[in-house]
Amino acid sequence: MKKIVALLLALCMVFALCACGNSSAKSDDIHIGIVTGSVSQSEDDRRGAEAFQAMYGEDMVKLAIYPDNFTEELETTIQTIVNLSDDPAMKAIIVNQAVPGTTEAFRRIKESRPDIICIAGESHEDLPEIGSAADLVCNNDFVARGYLIIRTAHELGCDTFVHISFPRHMSYETMSRRVAIMKAACDEFGMQFVLETAPDPTSDVGVAVAQAYILEKVPEWVEKYGQNAAYFCTNDAHTEPLLKQLLEYGGYFIEADLPSPTMGYPGALGIDLTEEAGDYEKILAKVEQAIVEKGGADHFGTWAYSYGYTVSAGLAQHALNVIKGESELTDIDDISKAYQVFSPNAAWNGSNYTNAETGVKLDNVFLVYQDTYIMGDPGHFMGSTSIEVPEKYFTIK
């Protein structure tokens, strides 16, 4: 009898060790790739990818960077994304921001590796187009935000809204539709809407020249449009010089194109966030204090948690949850759950994207946004995620 019991115990131990071995193998067999821009072009996107890698390790999470001049180096951009699929253990590839070339890269990946989950964060390509190649697309809600940013500016007492961009960005459906929505919202709230053009930092002129242009023009714009004008730019590299000059000469800034307390504010304010890195509650508090000290209370806003950081890390987390069978790929609640890991106190809202031309809702394309926070003493949330956007804005194009 003792021999039988001993044999059974030995068998149990063998089965347990096998089970542990299989579990470990499953974990080791999951590789996730994240492709972002460089720190100079989109720091928050990159930092979010690094945070996810730090959480799960370099063996599991593989990072890549597409060229700064991605419009001129299209094939390099495509190949940077595709190269991740050469890894036999690769199970998901996230691209944030999904710059031109991402759709083609995903198509090439699917030809040889249809098992890889392809996810696009903040697509620069038309959403129906990239939605045809990606398994999931998540963009900021340009429809709702187009209305809500103007509504917030109106509530803060602004009488003019100045939109700064360049032809490449204005060729994107997301940005051109948002401009149309912003203009319509300005009409509704009795505000003047102005379009200003600035150099494209990814063109031959480069980042330095583009930023110098903003530094030079803002004083002229403030003189022209007055102290009650709110400003918005579509490019990350334009944000810091715009904030710097608005703090000096006056004006409002509701939130960045891709909002974050670290989007432009540290450089514009001359503050070091090294000690606060990754802790967005501390980052927001330090940025807010500096804004107040410079006399900018109630004039400058953001999202409490970085959009780019949350998208890079959150979409990777969502992919991992899906791979493990814990989430559904195209469930907005599951996507929000993954985002919450990296923005624990944020209020989010979102919905499926509807093609304005066809009226067709895309099941794998989502538009999301976070509540707007206006910095002050004290600062306050605007409650944007609980405001119902009038239906007419969803069909403006």
Roles of regions detected by a PLM:
Residues 1-30, 397:
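Short, low-complexity disordered leader/linker segments with a strong preference
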Residues 29-79, 94-100:
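Extracytoplasmic "Venus flytrap"
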Residues 49, 142-195, 319:
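An alpha-beta-alpha
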Residues 185-193, 240-324:
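Extracellular/periplasmic periplasmic-binding protein-like sensory domains
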